[in-house]
């Protein structure tokens, strides 16, 4: 995997990689056999230097965790979408937007867009997303883990999208958009009761800290009980393209 953070930069041109310009941060992956992927990590403008046909996979930003006096909610992961067989014209600018993760006490994630596709950010916590967030009630009297791969989370409102959140919707693809965990705190670290985060970037707990969703996964942030507790932010989204397959 090759990362670039320069602006602008001409990437590709070796092996199976196409030549292109991109104004943001990205990573290129050579899958072998003439196959390739480009992961867009920050927003920017993509310009292919030759005509190409691509598939695109998009993940919206995850929601932040939310804390209440007697309960905690993990943020849901961002929604995902896959678009196939998109024709791109050489020397044409294509805008790519990477959705921000939600912040504060349960803030919603932002949408990711590009290449005719849009993936919505997760709704405000507790709310719908790619995979639902965890739920924790007073002293662990209710402990429900977060969802992953499109599954529902712990509360009735923390629902998943009901379809896979794997890359390009394929069974071998990496997981994205996991729901965030939830922690109830009473009496210091020894008093923490925790509902697990979902696979695919959901934020967990470390000591007394509610962790954010992982960057560029659309994972939900961890929620921690208490109206003044610092909540885990949602993970930013991502846009990935590959040669059409």
Spans of model-derived segments:
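Low-complexity, glycine/proline-biased repetitive segments and flexible coils/loops
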Residues: 2-245
